[in-house]
């Protein structure tokens, strides 16, 4: 395919402009044709993708009448003389508002401009109140870890706008809600750690009583968005500018949990109660459906009360994947039910839960994953709060844009509209269903389905969502456009901007429908990178409910069917198998997905698996591909700078340095000779400047990779034969193992990997054999 590179550039430009990548860029015209695609029609959409030239309009959008509510966009037919526009989604004729009376072909409003496929509206309605941050701190920690945690939170106060509201809850054996509005001395309300509390009980115990909600019409003060918090709630949740001194004092004087811990016991931690009370505090203070983040800092697992994941006896280990497989799980089901119920409550309120784990052992991310996954919260897994990985990742949560606004949205919702050719089958990402049924909701379900609208709660510029579609019927041209029929989809994202205003981001995407059955345009429109990421999200979604081997079989079956459908071959002749250029990388993406930590749980704790899957479901195409198939660069004397090499054991050479990027780890690996020279100190001697430069080059490139990455990756420097080299060896295609012969054409210098895993070549041989035989 001669123009493959040009098409790739076009898809990349669309991603930069609209934050959208589609698995197929031409849609089949019938359901029958669609069923033969194997890979579903899907879009990976990043609603808040940062883009300097996205117009920000300071007025309400022009919308179609209910129930459609489609927004005026460049694909609408507009009758300038009659001041009428036709909605492409429901084909209704709508009158343009009076202030559009002067529009003409030469003078069109920004939202109708052909380049305005993505546009943002700053809605006149302010948010009910400023964003809220509730810090929930575990005090059962070593002194140095607790001090580092307190310092990082004190630092974060300076990154928050003065009008942002803050609250503080600490927990150990008991949970304490701190009354920041009381300035005479430190004052807190204590809740028992072994009992769950309803919102009513929280309200009564902290003396909030029945309170009035903020008045809907309350106008924002200059520099203070939204209304102020209700008076009684001001005792616990206050603007940073008002309580920073008091909050800093309380944080600085925080001590380790005083409850004694025997040598053979774990500290008693009531994480579940602390989170439940945090949610209850927001509900009792009448902050429902306002932007709020509950930020949990856990230094260990919950060992007491509802949500406990392990008992206090150290001789009782926390559950492993093996225990879960054998159903040897004492607390898992009960804890999971507790946190899932809490997640439902929190997401209904529009609040976000972030989980920061600072512990070498597991803290219960597996049980708590629903809290972050359904509310768009962050999940950060580190060894300790003293680590730079935690400190820098936490600081990056508060990144700001050019106007000094926090790069985060609150209380977000997304709706997807489509023309009659398409129906929405579901979404995979950090969201919950809003159970909105409409004519464009599909019969089948993929991910969170049976709806065309979802609630995200938390949203940021990297947050990406996989949205899946099906073809509605037997096709036929759209009633909208002359010429080649087009299918149109519109993404509407409503969210509370950190400045306190409500915003609406609108992205409208149009793609051609294919011609008669067998149209080559379909195959040529396949974006293998987007398809690999969309399929990996489905695989991970399945892995949450199905057995691991079943998911791997599903991945294999889909790949064989895709190759059978789109490869060129003579039946039963594997040597004749050939894939077009825009399909060639797809099998190797699937090979690495099968071996990845997303589907293989061996050597990972359940908490790590939950963390890795959480991040995959948050990132865009580029970052997700790095996670699925890491990048490997080689540095040697025979070329300047890094040179991309195959992710293969044959790439390990004694006289090179390798830089591996798995997204979660950045690793610099020195070949045997390089490591010996470095240990001998040649780089510090005169005349070996080129060796010094060679050693520095991968470090500089690693710095660039780490620069904007969130969460901060673990940085590893290792040598051939060193224990840390396992991070590299586990990712490489094992083309040179202890089973391949030394005279089999493989360079003697390549690394031997001791594994029974099949190599990419063997995998491809089997794939070709099965694809040409028509076996699926």
Curated annotation (Swiss-Prot):
Species annotation: Phaeosphaeria nodorum (strain SN15 / ATCC MYA-4574 / FGSC 10173)
InterPro entries according to UniProt: ADF-H/Gelsolin-like_dom_sf (IPR029006), Gelsolin-like_dom (IPR007123), Gelsolin-like_dom_sf (IPR036180), Sec23 (IPR037364), Sec23/24_helical_dom (IPR006900), Sec23/24_helical_dom_sf (IPR036175), Sec23/24_trunk_dom (IPR006896), Sec23_24_beta_S (IPR012990)
Cross-referenced PANTHER family: PROTEIN TRANSPORT PROTEIN SEC23 (PTHR11141:SF0)
One protein family per Pfam: zf-Sec23_Sec24
A GO BP entry: COPII-coated vesicle cargo loading
Domain of life from the UniProt record: Eukaryota
Descriptive protein name: Protein transport protein SEC23
GO molecular function, one term: zinc ion binding
SUPFAM superfamilies: beta-sandwich domain of Sec23/24, C-terminal, gelsolin-like domain of Sec23/24, Helical domain of Sec23/24, vWA-like, Zn-finger domain of Sec23/24
Any one GO CC term of the record: COPII vesicle coat
UniProt record similarity statement: Belongs to the SEC23/SEC24 family. SEC23 subfamily.
Assembly behavior: The COPII coat is composed of at least 5 proteins: the SEC23/24 complex, the SEC13/31 complex, and the protein SAR1.
